[in-house]
Amino acid sequence: MVVLMRERSEIISWLTDMDGVLWHEGKAIPGAPELIKKWLEAETKFLVLTNNSIYTPHDLSIRLKSGGLNVPESLIYTSAMATADFLNHQSPRSTAYVIGENGLITAMHEIGYVFTESKPEYVVLGETRNLSFDSLTKAARFINAGSKFIATNPDATGPSKDGVLLATGSVAALLTRATGKDPYIVGKPNPMMFRSAMRKIGAHSETTAMIGDRMDTDVVAGI
């Protein structure tokens, strides 16, 4: 049997994770500032991808800069933005019940979605530090009544200096247990987020590489 191996294309564009690759506990990882600087100076196509839906790209750019990383907000793409792009394509200017922070709320407002507690078409779950029993109960009832269940990302936990933090995946599991409905997850490792990211910078999959640290999100999708 003859196996023909296709020659790999030259990598000219990059997608990179943020936490654990460029950034850890409020500081740039050694070598990351130099890499970003090199890419910017060479006008290399790249985009920072993160499943963090709490912050807007503007917020993240400021936070990264405070830790020594100069990443323009235009080169940051979050799971909240990917979720908004997905919903804008599926059902433009529709309605949603949203559990999340400023990053998700801003992204949803920017596509013209109306937030409502009256028969929303979607229940959209993002990462949040302000969960309440009331909001979870409402979400479960809307899902049981027919609202489509969307989650920004599958990560069950996130990092912090004090240990793990509960993240979107854990809350989604709770709602799934309560409703019997699994969410459609937009963020990594969903290939759709990567396709959207590549379109954003005019890149092609054959000449783009993914840099990540998590096998279950970054590496799986990169393959």
Model-derived segments and their meaning:
Residues R6, G112-E121:
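Short acidic low-complexity segments
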Residues E7-I29, V48-L49, G222:
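Asp-based phosphoryl-transfer active-site loop
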Residues L15-T16, A32, I36-L64, I76, ...:
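Substrate-recognition element of Asp-dependent hydrolases with the DxDx(T/V) motif
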Residues V71, S91-S94, A203-E206:
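Short helix-loop-beta connector
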Residues E73-A82, S118-E121, P154:
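A short, structured active-site edge motif that brings together acidic residues
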Residues F115, F133-D155:
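A short, gly/pro- and small-residue-rich
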Residues E117-D134:
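Short, well-ordered secondary-structure micro-motifs within conserved domains or adaptor modules
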Residues P183-V220:
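Conserved Lys-Pro-Asp/Glu-containing loop-to-beta segment of HAD-superfamily phosphomonoesterases
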